Regions:
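Basic, amphipathic alpha-helical segments enriched in Lys/Arg and hydrophobic/aromatic residues
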Residues: 136-169
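Phosphate- and divalent-cation-binding pockets in alpha/beta enzyme and binding domains
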Residues: 20-21, 42
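Anionic group-transfer/hydrolysis microenvironments
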Residues: 15, 37, 154
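Short, positively charged, Gly/Tyr-enriched micro-motifs
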Residues: 12-18, 25, 162-165
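Short, surface-exposed basic-aromatic patches at helix termini and helix-loop junctions that form
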Residues: 22-30
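An anionic, glycine-rich sequence signature occurring as long contiguous blocks
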Residues: 31-33, 37-138
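Mobile genetic element proteins and their domesticated derivatives, centered on retroelements
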Residues: 10-13, 32, 122, 144
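Conserved, well-structured functional cores that handle cations and Mg-NTP chemistry
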Residues: 1-12, 17-20
Length: 169
């Protein structure tokens, strides 16, 4: 059985960021937003290097920008999303089927007066659109978090003692 993905945007965590998975998504008529981390260190490094240079002089680089501010449960979160289409700065962009853009989300969280900032990197088959990227990633995490909550409540996942190695869950 296969998933009907035509017209969808598929978001995947870093572990699933592989060219063959991107190709399978495109073969089904869908677009992808793939997370970059240590799974693709050279590609992630090229996005990070580009973003560092961009921050030094943002007016010289075409880009899209979106900002979302959420305040909830004593926490303030600001997500600043930057989307780019300068693929020539990326390491081996031709490996990624129909790659059209990449993005950075700077997530700034303030809890009890302490602020942390995390930068997350993405590649996508969609045109550079910061608002769409920001929304798609946020929806991804809403689904992810609700699934973890269901596992914790329904299956007692948090009470599981076996958490490492080859232990069955």
């Amino acid at each position: 059985a296969t998933l009907a993905l035509e017209g969808c945007i598929v978001t995947i965590d870093a572990m699933g960021t592989q060219p063959n998975i991107a190709q399978a998504i495109r073969n089904r008529g869908a677009d992808y937003i793939l997370s970059l981390k240590d799974n693709q260190p050279t590609l992630a490094g090229s996005v990070e290097d580009f973003f560092v240079a961009f921050q030094a002089n943002p007016d010289k680089t075409p880009h899209c920008f979106d900002e979302v501010v959420e305040k909830d449960h004593g926490r303030l979160e600001v997500r600043r999303c930057y989307a780019f289409d300068q693929l020539d700065c990326l390491h081996a962009p031709e490996r990624w089927p129909d790659l059209k853009s990449f993005g950075v989300i700077a997530s700034e969280r303030t809890i009890k007066g302490k602020t942390t900032i995390e930068h997350r990197f993405y590649i996508s088959s969609l045109p550079a659109d910061a608002a769409r990227l920001n929304q798609a990633v946020r929806l991804h995490w809403r689904v992810e978090n609700s699934l973890h909550w269901c596992m914790d409540v329904a299956f007692g996942d948090d009470r599981m003692r076996a958490r490492t190695g080859n232990a069955a869950h």
